[in-house]
Amino acid sequence: MEIKIETIVPREVLENICITSLEGGSNYWYYLSSNAIKIIRNAVPKSVDSYLSTAILKAVLDHNVEVPINDVEDEEEIIGYLSSKTLQERIQALANSDDSWALHNELKEEGDASSSDIVFQYMVLGEVVYG
């Protein structure tokens, strides 16, 4: 017997994940190209939000922008996208995976660079690929 549990992930939790992962937890595998930054800044100018780590989520959630995420070792290679179209299904996949502890830590406000990295990988790639 299986019981399906759905959890609401507040925007504030998603913001914290983006801040922690983009400012350190995930920088060993991802790269934001100048094109990605341009896409983000066209949706959310610096005058609205000067921090890229929070502007990226605003661009995705508020302006339905799809942000390409590149490989840090091959800056030309797009390895995934941060998109409102895939965000829910990918976070649900995380909630149903062996890595769900990372999401639970974030929801309990006990997240760190490791848990944020795992959640961010699911948000962008749909699975843990790095680390």
Residue ranges and their predicted role:
Residues 1, 70-76, 126-127:
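Short, flexible beta-strand-to-coil junctions
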Residues 1-69:
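Long, contiguous N-terminal structural blocks used for assembly/anchoring
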Residues 91-101:
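Short acidic, glycine/tyrosine-flanked loop/strand segments centered on an H-E-D-like triad
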Residues 104-130:
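Acidic, proline/glycine-rich low-complexity IDRs
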